[in-house]
Amino acid sequence: TLKRNDIPFDEGNYQMIEYLDSYLISDTKKVKVKDIGKKVALTNSFFFDYLKEYHIPTSFLRIDGEASLKFSITKELPFRIKILNSADKRNSKIFGIKEGTELNLPVFEFHYGCGKESLISESHLIAFDLCTPEDMKLITRICSKINAVLKSFFERRNEILAEICCHFGKYEDKVFLIGDFSPASLKIFPKDESVKWTNPYKLSSAAEVKKYTEHLFNIASVK
């Protein structure tokens, strides 16, 4: 997980998020990675602006400083949606297929909390008043569009979008994408299996985190 500082709302009801040069690779191990905060901030800025071109609502306003982003005020919804286009370790074991196998249709997983048993269903979210049925339909539609846009983006660059994790917030009656495009939430790998690559599911050292972060940054930097 990328470490960050959430700076309190200012008088204009904006929030600043500062990305730090450290990464939590396990519950007990944090590594320092030079310039990772700046590169993740720039990568995030690129993808937020890119999705805006496709009329996807986001709370992102602009980059503000070397490693900080400015967002409009929202109340973060207490769950996240993990979109899978390839079988991850958990699903490959359940369904008896090779890890990394591309799926015919995306799988939407809903997660609540940070524990290992975070996977829940849509009905959990509605039953426990964490989301209304109307907002759930809207969020699912937005996720489908995000996945289609980014999957196509990476395919054109000979990359496979294996997974993306989306976080949402609300302001008044509107829903906004609020994050995130960090190494922890965006998993890609090359179409060409002969290409040497860093497995985003197995980032266990500062060097691996740096290499994968730079890979995402370089893709976002290519115009």
Question: Which role does the model predict for each range below?
Answer:
Residues 181-223:
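C-terminal helix-cap and adjacent tail motif
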